[in-house]
Amino acid sequence: VQAGYSGSLQGLQEARWGYLSPNAFDWNGDGLPDLVTGDITGDYHVYLNRGTRTEPRLDPARPLYCDGINLHGMWRCRPAAARIGDRVALVIVDGEDHFHLYWRIDDYNVEDGGKLPQESGKPIGCSGGVGGKSGRAKLDLFDWNQDGHLDLVIGTNRVNSIPDRATGLPMPGIGIKTLGTPLLMLNTGTNAKMKFARPE
């Protein structure tokens, strides 16, 4: 993965950079871990595993589509993926800088599940600014408190401000000295209708 001449929002000097952000997950339900990725361009791809668990052989990257359009969001973000019942959920940081849920239709297509809300009903924001201060979050869905509901575990960069720029973490809540801070947002709704508490 490389940005090429126009793929990095920080300019041509990053033409050879990729910032691949993979999540290993059984995307197609065949029992083998595949890779679902974000990268420097903000596009999302899947690498299906045609080998085995111990000797994986990945297909070339294939783009993910929603309504026939390439799934696109903020740059340098890792998507979260989880199986919920007989469906697969995918969470990305969308182009409006909000945590956004999609549902797998088939190997290369997803449908829109809407923005993930805070308990207040407001969408969950990610970035502390624009350009290089955007994106960069690494997302995972995991039942942290073992209540049966999937929570958000988030790896951050010092420029993230989750869930909003006024009061978010790690900036401005912790301050400029922070480097990267793992955050937890507990799901106080259900897996069918998620809503999330403020990060801690």
Residue ranges and their predicted role:
Residues 1-200:
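Beta-propeller-forming repeat regions
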